[in-house]
């Protein structure tokens, strides 16, 4: 493993660019390139699914206790032809006070022909003053599958009535020829939270890009999240490219349960088999 260039100071935040490359070889998907540095850490690879022994699962961890003011974190992920890969987080990521600079997390994903890629994050926990911007871009081959999930939950550890500053998310998904399939963007401030979400304090999205015959029933995806006590709504993605699920929950634990359940429905539809539980 090589560590990328990193700048790190309490006043400026940290800037790091990381990369992961997954290929299929010898009947398994394998991590061919790993370029990761502090504060990110990637576990060893796991093969958790007897029904899909080729599927590689990695856990992405934060070694620093969360995201801090001024952090600029980037990750480039490539999943080669025929590979199957799931990148998830070990636990929720705490987002600290942005102090007027906030944190930015960038993700770029390339999924080649016949490949399966899932990138599912536990909710970002927004502490008072937190400001986080997510910027994600993906390129997905016509017969490939991409599942992406992320969201946030609000937490005021000292119960002083303080809220986060802002959470924003932008996602663009294209075909290899550059054709835009989907563009999704949202922004919410702590001041507007109650007006926008009502009694809910956590929200997330799941996007599944897949050929039509590899999509689960919309109702099944929605009901999986609802059974956890969340409020979910699913619909077709633009350009007949897949499905989009929106989820609201009262807290981060309920949201995590709902998103995990929805992921397993999405993965079963895309792969044709049920995946094992990802222990955290």
Curated annotation (Swiss-Prot):
InterPro entries referenced in this protein's UniProt entry, alphabetically: UreD
Primary site of residence: cytoplasm
Pfam families: UreD (PF01774)
Keyword Transmembrane helix: no
One Gene Ontology term, aspect cellular component: cytoplasm
Localization terms from the record: Cytoplasm
Any one GO MF annotation of this record: nickel cation binding
Record key words, sorted: Chaperone, Cytoplasm, Nickel insertion
Subunit and interaction comment: UreD, UreF and UreG form a complex that acts as a GTP-hydrolysis-dependent molecular chaperone, activating the urease apoprotein by helping to assemble the nickel containing metallocenter of UreC. The UreE protein probably delivers the nickel.
Functional description taken from the UniProt entry: Required for maturation of urease via the functional incorporation of the urease nickel metallocenter.
Family, as annotated: Belongs to the UreD family.
Entry-linked PANTHER family: UREASE ACCESSORY PROTEIN D
Protein name per its UniProtKB record: Urease accessory protein UreD 1
Gene symbol of the encoding locus: ureD1
């Amino acid at each position: 493993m090589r560590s990328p260039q990193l700048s790190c100071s309490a006043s400026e935040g940290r800037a790091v660019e990381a990369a992961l490359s997954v290929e299929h070889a010898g009947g398994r998907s394998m991590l061919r390139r790993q370029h990761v540095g502090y504060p990110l850490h990637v576990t060893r690879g796991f093969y958790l699914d007897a029904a899909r022994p080729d599927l590689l699962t990695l856990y992405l961890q934060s070694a620093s206790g969360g995201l801090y003011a001024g952090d600029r974190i980037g990750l480039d992920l490539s999943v080669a032809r025929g590979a199957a890969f799931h990148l998830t987080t070990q636990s929720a990521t705490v987002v600290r006070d942005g102090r007027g600079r906030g944190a930015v997390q960038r993700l770029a994903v390339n999924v080649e022909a016949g490949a399966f890629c899932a990138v599912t994050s536990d909710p970002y926990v927004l502490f008072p003053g937190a400001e986080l911007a997510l910027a994600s871009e993906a390129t997905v081959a016509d017969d490939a599958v991409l599942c992406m999930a992320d969201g946030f939950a609000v937490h005021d550890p000292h119960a002083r009535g303080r809220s986060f500053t802002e959470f924003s998310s932008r996602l663009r998904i294209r075909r290899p020829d550059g054709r835009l399939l989907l563009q999704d963007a949202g922004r919410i401030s702590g001041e507007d939270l109650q007006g926008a979400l009502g009694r809910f304090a956590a929200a997330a999205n799941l996007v599944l890009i897949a050929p039509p015959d590899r999509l689960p029933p919309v109702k099944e995806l929605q009901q999986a999240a609802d059974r956890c006590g969340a409020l979910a709504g699913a619909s077709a993605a633009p350009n007949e490219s897949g499905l989009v699920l929106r989820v609201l929950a009262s807290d981060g634990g309920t949201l995590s349960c709902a998103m995990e359940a929805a992921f397993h429905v999405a993965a079963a539809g895309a792969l044709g088999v049920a995946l094992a539980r990802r222990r955290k």
